[in-house]
A protein has these predicted regions:
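N-terminal amphipathic/basic leader segments beginning at the initiator methionine
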Residues: 1-22
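Generic C-terminal helix-cap and adjacent flexible tail
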Residues: 276-279, 296-299
Length: 299
């Protein structure tokens, strides 16, 4: 199976898991749950669930066991996009080629649906079946996702990003923003996949952390590049939005070609981390394919 097929299989698996976890929620057919469903299943690449599945399967964990952490991390990602798109933050009206949640359902419902997705993520991790995953590792996943999505991770990074609008920041400050805003949740996805494998997965965490940190930053560099060279129809969101908001970006700081070089260098570092795991007879091909995809994608 080539990488596009692998990614599509992950999209289908993750979407089915999300539907399964959303279906028992009360107040179906109300604007709140309709907005929740819309925000969670609006489309998207499902890269974070892919990282959960690919990492866990590398250690022989059954894919159905990985549905819970994969769906949980996507719930957090989806809620963050719903809130990022609000007028008080990035003020976007287009997401994945469709109206953003607050445009379709109103700001109040978008906020509440985002809140509900955040809490659903932790409900899934706490209660969903995970065959052969001890309580210790389940609790570790809860902690990982909480740290990655809160002040120490995604929310902290978003706050730094908002504070930096209209200001010139240096490369170190920009990397600090994105290691939190984007990278923390990517790292959590990889770590949750590893934790599902118990001690074998825990032993691999140092190499996996380096891999995740490098692809997380490369993902943001590529996003910044696409904001310059992409088009709205392909991206599914406003092209040039970062410049309009006065955000510092890697192309603005480094120039377009040096930004591309930085993305490639980060992916090369990520591959070197995988070499350590391949030397232990682990099949890292899916994680390597994702790393390559990050700098080849056009949306």
């Amino acid at each position: 199976m080539d990488f596009p097929q692998q990614l599509q299989a992950c999209v289908e698996q993750a979407n089915e898991a999300l539907r399964r976890f959303i279906a028992p929620q009360p107040f179906q057919n109300t604007p709140l749950v309709e907005a929740l469903h819309y925000g969670a299943l609006l489309g998207g690449k499902r890269l974070r669930p892919f990282l959960v599945y690919a990492t866990g399967e590398m250690f022989g964990v059954c894919r159905t066991t990985l549905d819970a952490p994969a769906a949980a991390v996507e719930c957090i990602h989806a809620y963050s996009l719903m809130h990022d798109d609000l007028p008080a933050m990035d003020d976007d009206d287009l997401r994945r080629g469709l109206p953003t949640c607050h445009i379709k359902f109103g700001e109040a419902n978008a906020i509440l649906a985002g809140d509900a997705l955040q809490t659903l993520a932790f409900s899934i991790l706490s209660d969903a079946p995970m065959v052969d995953v001890p309580d210790r590792d389940r609790l570790a996943m809860v902690s990982e996702l909480a740290q990655a999505s809160g002040v120490a991770g995604m929310c902290g990074g978003q706050a730094l990003d908002l504070q930096a609008e209209g200001q010139q920041v240096d490369l170190q400050a920009l990397e600090r923003i994105h290691r939190h805003k984007t990278g923390a949740l990517i790292r959590a996805a990889v770590r949750m996949g590893a934790l599902s494998a118990g001690e074998r997965g825990r032993a691999a965490l140092p190499a996996l952390d380096r891999y995740a940190e490098n692809i997380g930053l490369a993902f943001q560099v590529q996003d910044d590049i696409l904001d310059v060279v992409g088009d709205t129809a392909t991206l599914g969101k406003r092209q040039g939005a970062d410049q309009q908001l006065g955000k510092s970006t890697y192309p603005a700081l480094l120039g377009l070609e040096q930004a591309r070089k930085k993305a490639h260098d980060l992916i090369a570092d990520a591959r070197r981390s995988l070499d350590e795991l391949a030397a232990q007879s682990l099949d890292t091909s899916a994680l390597e394919a994702l790393a390559n995809y990050i700098i080849q994608r056009d949306k």
